[in-house]
Swiss-Prot record:
Binds 1 Fe(2+) ion per subunit. The record marks C167 as: May be catalytically important. Its cofactor is Fe(2+). This is GTP cyclohydrolase MptA. Homodimer. It comes from the Archaea.
């Protein structure tokens, strides 16, 4: 009996009925377990979500999406055998791998986001607790014009950290009221001034979310831990999962002794970035955001700065 052989058509490689380029074609919400090894420390285990894209030329109906999964899995296997690794380098390697697999594409993009658990101790009693920080990384690879085997890779690393802010405006109103009340009770002016310097006045608070991302060329590394520290210390106070009464006193007092507008937080982050990363190239792209969830309003307060590192250095060091 003679067997028939069928050649399955490559539908993706056929020509589309409407011949236009597509900027991004790929997969989103791809869940992967990522283990990042660290020097002399326990590895970080992350449940990560990936978005993976390539561009598509006008003469091709579709992309080979299975290659996206192959590219991610191959790089994740490589990570397991590497002693030290960064999540932005993971995205960079995946983007590079994608262009190698999608010969028809000129650029590839990878986005990754995870929840990163960090250990914290409460400020007074030292109770250990875990805090969640949202971290994210991105990478883009562009094929060279004259050399198809050359890929220009850019990578981005960032974090979003929750903290606390205290409103300076309402605090000044309450400070003025306290001064007037004390004066009516017969307290002398010098005593009132000393009292107000030692005891912070009431104000309304916000739960703030500070966000920093730094985009650099593939051969520069940016410390994620440094980004997290910068965001934390740029608000009025850190927040903690577990607090005893003495801890609450420290947190509330710290925040109200250090009141900040949403704009102050962004400027503080910018200043700390310049101080923390003296070797970062001038063409690094810095994005800083602060979102404060108001307690006495229905709206949120927002501030942002997007700049090159060189621009921030010039403004802050002038």
């Amino acid at each position: 009996m003679e067997h028939c052989t069928f050649n399955l058509p490559d539908v993706q490689a056929s020509k589309p009925s409407i011949a236009i380029n597509l900027t991004r074609v790929g997969v989103t919400n791809m869940k992967k377990l990522v283990e990042i090894k660290r020097k002399d420390k326990r590895p970080i285990v992350l449940i990560s979500t990936f978005d993976v894209f390539v561009d598509l030329p006008s003469d091709r109906k579709g992309a080979n999406l299975s290659r996206n999964f192959e590219a991610v899995d191959e790089v994740l296997e490589k990570v397991l055998s590497t002693p030290v690794y960064e999540i932005e380098q993971l995205c960079s390697d995946i983007a590079h791998n994608l262009l190698g697999r999608h010969e028809y594409a000129n650029q590839a993009e990878v986005r990754m986001k995870s929840e990163y658990m960090i250990r914290r101790a409460s400020p007074s009693t030292g109770i250990k607790c875990q805090e969640v920080v949202n971290i994210f990384a991105e990478a883009s690879a562009v094929r060279g014009v004259g050399d198809k085997d050359y890929f220009d890779v850019k990578k981005l690393i960032g974090a979003e950290v929750v903290g606390m802010t205290a409103c300076p405006c309402a605090q000044e109103i309450m400070r003025d009221k306290a001064a007037n009340e004390l004066a009516e009770l017969g307290v002398d002016r010098d005593t009132i001034i000393r009292f107000l310097e030692k005891v912070p006045m009431a104000t309304h608070n916000q739960r703030g979310r500070g966000i920093i991302s730094i985009k650099v060329a593939h051969d520069f590394d940016v410390s994620l831990e440094s980004i997290i520290r910068i965001i934390e210390r740029s608000m009025s106070s850190s927040v903690y999962e577990v607090l005893k009464r003495s801890d609450e006193k420290v947190v509330v007092e710290t925040a109200h002794m250090n009141p900040k507008f949403v704009e102050d937080c962004v400027r503080a982050m910018a200043d700390n970035i310049v101080k923390e990363f003296p070797n970062l190239p001038d063409n690094a792209v810095i994005t800083i955001k602060q979102i404060n969830e108001e307690s006495i309003h229905r709206h949120n307060a927002f501030a942002e700065r997007v700049a090159l590192m060189g621009e921030l250095r010039s403004e802050i060091n002038q």
